[in-house]
Amino acid sequence: MMTLVIVFGIGGCSLPPNENHDRSNSLQTKTKWMNDPQADLNIENGLTAFLALDDAFLSIASRIHLIRNAKHQLDLQYYIWNDDAIGNLMLHELLNAADRGVKVRLLIDDQNGIKLDKALKALAQHPNFEIRIFNPYKFRHLRFIDYIFRLKQINHRMHNKLTLADHSIAVTGGRNISSEYFDAGDQFQFSDMDILFYGKAVERAEEVFDEFWNHPLSYSTEQLLGQGTAQQLENLRISYKTLDQVNTPTEDKLEAAQDYLKLRLENYPIQWAKAHFVADHPDKARGQAQQQQLLYSQVLNIMGKPEQHMELVSAYFVPTERGTAYLNQLSKDGIKVRVLTNSLVANDVAVVHSFYSQYRKPLLQNGVQLYEFKPNIERKKRTWYEIATGSVIPVKGKNRSSLHAKFFDVDGKVFIGSFNFDPRSAHLNTEVGLVVESDHLQDQITAMLDQHLLQVAYQLKLDEHGNIVWCEHKDNGEVIQHHHDPESTRFQRFTMNVVSYFPIEWMM
């Protein structure tokens, strides 16, 4: 009986035709966003201003700053947009922008699930608010059927993260829209990196958004969810206003972060450099992109082969045999190669660790420096918020944490974006990022890693027998050596070893 139901469902349920859906492009009206008297000249000379955002609250504040100050248009593109405090805060801010006449376009990958469907359906009723869903599942409430019969199609996801305002200023990086990416989760936090940029590189970012927005894999909410009603939109307004009336520590920190960010943009010198927005073509989600349309090809062309050093931070690191050979050869050629990724217990996608772990020993044997992010981080320094407000945030033990950042630098060129060093980012998902040609930014990143790496990560080495040891550096100078993945159980290690034999590395 179940077989008949599934077969009948497959025959009777299909996505609506979408090849000729309404096309729209970004408005070309630009807004001035900073008080730099040289800004216009720098942009004419092909330069881009940038501000790296390693602090979670400054990162969410930058997005809210763009939304609240946009005058003409907002374009947002995300892989995950959760139905939580941060997700609803951002939707409310976008609704407020639409109310004051700003054109809002929101594109979300359908891997996000159905929890936001009700809100998205209501928001799409607003005349200034357009919402599309990328590469949707046919069976929205029985998604396992898609995994069985449409794996080739739904295995490609839009992993992009991008916020654009007035065709002038943007934020990209590794963070999705969810509380755990912005230090607002109750039990779990991601450590991540974004970058705010203004100037020449934004032009390409807007072109990329339009390519995805107008692609046949982007479906309107009306096509997938049906038409919403004015009453549904009004009910959503009421729920957002109710949430607004509850003042939380998160709201206080966000207000302080926005003030701090505004001060930085208006009164502090902002770095300018040549920068390149890079992205996969949306046809990659169909497996049809040409080589030159792939992000990693664009990055290699811009950054070139390392001559002095390469620092790589990747939440999900599966170098494959080819990538391992490449990194090993760099190290043999005398180039300093330093890699930071998640430890087994820190990794929120544990199966990825199964296919990374087999490459650790060959990398170490050839001189590649390897570090693994600890699953529990104790905060050692005062945050910008404590310094700016004179307050002290109490620390209650350790926070469960995971590395989610994706950035690397090669000889004065820095990439910050959504791309992980793994087969999924290279061949399956679409990705975006910004390459900045800046010795200053590279020096900042190198100094940050030098200062904090031994605090937040285990240093991997080989002992006299050629076995891997995990070195945990304590504040008092003591070094504790672990002889298996720290804080893991025997069952976890056994399971990861078994999974590593499955022929699915190409999906990682």
For each feature predicted by the language model, list its residue ranges.
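Bacterial N-terminal signal peptides
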Residues: 2-9
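Charged, low-complexity intrinsically disordered terminal segments
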Residues: 12-132, 136-156, 165-508
